[in-house]
């Protein structure tokens, strides 16, 4: 069993920076305390400081960050530490690309492309995939790093893709040069176009029931990304068919849950009218968890505060709400991705009264893990197959935060059968609480035969 060992500086610094305090708070009351694992600080001696590797960060407070979880069986400290750092770097790239898209929307067509399924793909999708691939391979040189990821290099490698490839290479190098700020090694020289293509191609694993591999969705919710709304960078590690850790980067996730109901353009407008105090946390975070630890964690994005400082992660837990009348349920924004009419019928049958929270990407999983919503339901139309990269990281984070995620038949999601969630029973249901989850599963059984899905 692990232990929570954070320095006394944590609560004070968190409050000063605007990050939710670690102390009692009405928003967090009634949640279960499960002190089993945590990021912890460890003193770094003068003799050891010079020998710290690039992947080990010594902060200004003479501490380095370590992952302390012995509740989950195998020790994944090295993988967890690296994954959180890598996702922090990826978030920086995404924010820069999104800001560029929003500032010059008239030129966005040159940086947003449509895939065969008509979903958009951007410089950020390829850039993040290249960065994550390079950083993981560099951090685990002693291993044969295997990665399952969403994008390929076909468009970039085509005769018409030269200008787009140049933009991707520039974005990648601009971020990798800052890798040491995150406790990671940067390349000795800038990556060439060939290097970037090779990094993207390295993410060609097909998963399966054996072995260890990373699962990456470089920009989950690309439509939300190009619209200036919610999106996520999702990285998970799967070993022998089980998701063992997950990291979600949510660059636009707001401090106040009420802002999830509004498009980010209103958030940006309000931020311009009444900007938050300098150095305070108002949006953007990374959430992470390891299977079996019984805890999930959240910390603000690094760039807001400068150099990476691990003194202010805080535990996140699911909501304690059980009454459907008070529960908030999430569903995808796009009707093509899920049946809004079916979920509306289910919501009515189980007594949900609030309007659905329609959010892009795995931010829906993040909302449940943080206690900002209680239910996520997705029922794709016939013929659609869910991919593992759209769910792996979010599932383990909700589970370790105290929630439940299954298919609509109440069975665990199976990540051992390749890139798709094969054998999925009708849809996916994630809940903060087991009884609420069972009510929805029962309602699906009662309503399914009359649906048109």
Regions of interest found by a model, annotated:
Residues 90, 94, 125, 136, ...:
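Residue-level signal for inorganic ion chemistry
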Residues 107-212:
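N-terminal assembly/interaction segments in proteins that build large macromolecular machines
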Residues 97-105:
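Secondary-structure edge/capping motif, primarily at the C-terminal ends of alpha-helices
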Residues 194-201, 209-284, 290:
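DPxDG-like acidic metal-binding loop motif
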Residues 2-18, 30, 34-92, 99, ...:
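Oxyanion/phosphate-interacting regions
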Residues 158-163, 258-261, 301, 343:
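Short aromatic-enriched loop/helix-cap "lid" or pocket-rim segments at secondary-structure transitions
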Residues 293-300:
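Short polybasic amphipathic segments
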């Amino acid at each position: 069993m692990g232990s929570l060992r954070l320095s006394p500086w944590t609560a004070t610094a968190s409050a000063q920076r605007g990050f939710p305090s670690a102390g009692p708070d009405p928003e967090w009351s009634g949640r279960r305390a499960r002190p089993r694992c945590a990021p912890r600080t460890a003193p770094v001696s003068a003799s050891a400081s010079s020998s710290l590797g690039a992947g080990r960060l010594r902060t200004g407070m003479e501490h380095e960050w370590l992952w302390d979880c012995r509740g989950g069986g195998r020790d994944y400290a090295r993988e967890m530490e690296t994954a959180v750092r890598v996702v922090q770097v990826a978030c920086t790239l995404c924010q820069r690309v999104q800001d560029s898209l929003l500032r010059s929307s008239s030129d966005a067509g040159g940086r947003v492309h449509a895939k065969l399924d008509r979903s958009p793909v951007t410089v950020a999708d390829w850039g993040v995939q290249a960065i994550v691939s390079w950083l993981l391979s560099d951090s685990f040189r002693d291993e044969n790093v295997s990665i399952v990821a969403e994008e390929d290099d076909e468009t970039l490698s085509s005769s018409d893709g030269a200008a787009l490839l140049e933009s991707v290479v520039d974005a990648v190098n601009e971020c990798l040069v800052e890798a040491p700020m995150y406790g990671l090694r940067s390349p000795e020289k800038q990556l060439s176009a060939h290097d970037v293509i090779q990094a993207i191609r390295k993410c060609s694993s097909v998963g399966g029931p054996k072995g260890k591999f990373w699962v990456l969705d470089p920009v989950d919710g690309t439509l939300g990304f190009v619209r200036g709304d919610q999106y996520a960078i999702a990285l998970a590690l799967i070993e022998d068919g089980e998701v063992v850790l997950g990291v979600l980067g949510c660059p636009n996730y707001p401090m106040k849950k009420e802002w999830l109901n509004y498009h980010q353009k209103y958030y940006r407008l309000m931020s311009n009218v009444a900007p938050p105090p300098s150095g305070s946390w108002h949006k953007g975070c990374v959430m992470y968890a390891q299977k079996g630890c019984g805890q999930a964690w959240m910390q603000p994005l690094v760039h807001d505060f400068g150099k990476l400082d691990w003194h202010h992660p805080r535990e996140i837990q699911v909501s304690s709400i059980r009454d459907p009348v008070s529960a908030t349920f999430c569903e995808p924004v796009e009707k093509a991705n899920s049946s809004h009419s079916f979920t509306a019928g289910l919501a009515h049958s189980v007594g949900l009264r609030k309007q659905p929270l329609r959010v892009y990407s795995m931010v829906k999983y993040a909302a449940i893990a943080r206690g900002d919503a209680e239910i996520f339901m997705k029922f794709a139309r016939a013929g659609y197959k869910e991919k593992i990269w759209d769910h792996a990281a979010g599932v383990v984070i909700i589970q370790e935060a105290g929630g439940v995620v299954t298919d609509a038949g109440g069975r665990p999601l199976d990540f051992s059968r390749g890139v798709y969630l094969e054998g999925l029973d009708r849809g996916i249901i994630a809940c903060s609480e087991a009884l609420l989850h069972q009510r929805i599963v029962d309602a699906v059984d009662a309503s399914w035969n009359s649906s048109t899905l």
